[in-house]
A protein has these predicted regions:
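AlphaC helix of the protein kinase catalytic domain
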Residues: 355-365
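Conserved protein kinase catalytic/activation segment
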Residues: 398-409
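C-terminal lobe helix-coil module of Hanks-type protein kinase domains
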Residues: 437-537
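Activation segment signature within eukaryotic-like protein kinase domains
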Residues: 373-374
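Protein kinase catalytic-loop region centered on the HRD/HxD motif
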Residues: 379-389
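Conserved HxN/HPN-centered segment at the entrance to the catalytic loop
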Residues: 326-334
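PP2C/PPM-type serine/threonine phosphatase catalytic domain
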Residues: 1-297, 303-317, 338-346, 350, ...
């Protein structure tokens, strides 16, 4: 049985010597699949003492984090999800203050400090603003993991430098900590940590190891006994088990693999019409839903790869990914009300042809047609990128052009989902999944991909549509190290006969640069430059062969000289 993430929790809060408890805290341990996809969240907030409404701020901050974090996209990383939630909470709190009688006195507004920890797989993600603290127990000592955002005026006077709700823009500290079974973390407000030492904390945790609520209560009571004049809150998290690094979709599907299908056969409520495509990776069939009469495409795993667990894991993810992308330029999944009995993927049927076939049928397309297709593909890719996904295998075979000229991105078997990759970071980038001719150089260098890598693939397709060949030919397949990447020679796309101006070549050259940091910062910038001449490219000329490929220039020069010598010798001999 696969081991999952297990923790023990202890919490206690007390108003102490104050009339109102302005602290708030909470822990949420979700069920699967959210446990693997989003992790366990623990949050602690402390309302500022100068405000009579800060308890509302701290309660709102904790509740919104625990509720909204799990409503963010499952494909997002912990960092992205938590930041979006905290930024939204900060904006709401700041707006509440501006609408209240405390608009011109922020020290009396809806302001609180906050520290949060999200434990996902074997990593603790820490988010912090203010002066709550997060510690890790190290033997009999406490290792402080957060920094207090306090500005020291004198030995007796300090004030908060950062907090939720105090400014319209939020600056959050973020860090990650690798965890292992047995690790213990402590979250505490200043009413606790300023009055209780590490020796008492570790002693209380060890004494109440079987019941951590008792440890938290003992620490709070000791802080009160030692004179704490503030609200006192403590949370204790102990890691009991860390999940094996297998990934979210590594559990073998309980559904059986389907057989090869024949025309006119009935399969799981679908009537098979014919096979559309067959390859070493999968088989795709045209089918009709017997219940709705809707035409669909069914994709089943290849027989040759049915024992390949890595392939089956990626196959399981394809429909999951498709359901999280909403774009007219990305293939849409299809679902049925009845229970599925086999492992396959059902999608909309697109009547058309692959971009590869379209390029063969249209070897010299006009520039405007190319622009329209590239713009559609770029829009589809941006839908992936908004969800923190990378396609990683964009090529003409993975784009369909329907009868109306609409482009649709297909095949999600190589897609990298950042939020899922966090669950198995060492396995996430283990192999290059894309097609070599369209794969960005950084993948070959083991650097991993980014949205700029997908842009490289898109630019390579654009280049091929305009010129009929690839920008680097077969050079990409020869990359073995950084020096090989810098040796790549871009072949200019300028072609007066084809009507490709220099500024188009300039846009392509930049998007296809071997160094991802020298490409366009965003795909929209590249697409914009395909329609709007960048002044920097307007004087672009056809680069002489000597500059483009000095080695080839001297080889040709030497060959020409050799031929000339042979001719001269022949003439002399004839005399």
């Amino acid at each position: 049985m696969t081991r999952g993430l297990l923790i023990s929790v202890g919490q206690h809060s007390d108003k102490g010597r104050k009339p109102v408890n302005q602290d708030f805290h909470g822990v949420l341990i979700p069920e699967e699949p959210l446990l693997s996809l989003k992790g366990i969240a623990a949050v602690l907030a402390d309302g500022i003492s100068s405000s009579t409404v800060s308890q509302i701020a701290s309660e709102s901050a904790v509740k919104s984090f625990l509720m909204d974090y799990y409503c963010t996209s499952e494909s997002w990383t912990v960092k992205t999800s938590a930041r979006r939630v905290l930024e939204a909470t900060n904006s709401w709190l700041h707006a509440q203050t501006r609408k209240s009688q405390y608009a011109y006195d922020r020290d009396k507004g809806y302001v609180c400090t906050l520290s949060a920890m999200v434990i996902k797989a074997a990593t603790a993600h820490i988010f912090h603003v203010g002066d709550c603290r997060i510690y890790r127990l190290a033997g009999k000592a406490l290792e402080q993991l957060t920094d207090d955002h306090r500005i020291i005026v004198s030995s007796e006077q300090t004030y908060l430098g950062r907090a939720l709700g105090i400014n319209p823009q939020l600056e959050i500290d973020y860090q990650t900590v690798e965890i292992q079974a047995g690790d213990t973390f402590l979250l505490a407000t200043d009413g606790a940590y300023e009055f209780v030492d590490a020796r008492f904390v570790t002693s209380a945790i060890n004494e109440h190891a079987a019941e951590l609520d008792g440890a938290a209560k003992a620490i709070v009571e000791e802080a009160y006994r030692r004179g704490s004049d503030d609200n006192i809150t403590v949370q204790i998290l102990r890691i009991d088990a860390v999940p094996e690094e297998t990934g979210v979709f590594d559990r073998t599907s309980t559904l059986p693999l389907p057989p090869l299908l024949e025309p006119r056969a009935m399969f799981d409520g679908y009537r098979i019409i014919r096979e559309i495509h067959g390859s070493s990776r999968s088989h795709i069939y045209l089918a009709v839903d017997a219940e709705t009469e809707e035409t669909v495409a069914l994709k089943i795993p290849s027989i040759d790869l049915r024992d390949n667990q890595a392939y089956l894991k990626r196959f399981l993810m394809e429909e999951w990914i498709a359901r999280r992308i909403d774009s007219p330029y990305v293939l849409k999944p299809r679902s049925r009300s009845t229970r599925r009995n086999y492992l396959y993927v059902a999608t909309e049927f697109v009547e058309g042809q692959t971009l590869r076939q379209w390029m063969l049928d249209n070897p010299r397309p006009d520039l405007e047609t190319v622009r329209r297709i590239i713009e559609q593909i770029a829009t589809g890719l941006r839908a992936f990128h908004r969800m923190e996904m990378l396609h990683q295998d964009l090529r003409p075979d993975n784009v369909l052009i329907d009868k109306t000229g609409t482009a649709k991105i297909i095949d999600f078997g190589s897609v990298r989902v950042a939020g899922v990759a966090e669950a198995a970071p060492r396995a996430a980038d283990a192999e290059i999944l894309g097609t070599v001719q369209y794969t960005a150089p950084e993948y070959f260098l083991g650097q991993g991909g980014s949205p700029r890598s997908d842009m490289f693939s898109l630019a390579a397709i654009c280049y091929q549509m305009l010129t009929g060949h690839l920008p680097y030919g077969a050079q990409l397949a020869k990359i073995r190290g950084r020096s090989d990447a810098w040796k790549l020679r871009y072949r200019p796309a300028i072609d007066a006969e084809r009507g490709i101006p220099g500024w188009i070549d300039g846009a392509l050259r930049k998007a296809l640069h071997p160094d991802p940091y020298k490409r366009h910062e965003d795909m929209s910038e590249f697409v914009f430059e395909l329609r709007n001449p960048n002044p920097a490219y307007l004087n672009t000329r056809i680069t002489p062969l000597l500059e483009r490929n000095p080695l080839m220039f001297w080889k040709l020069t030497s060959a020409a000289l050799a031929c000339a010598v042979v001719v001269l010798l022949a003439l002399l001999h004839a005399r």
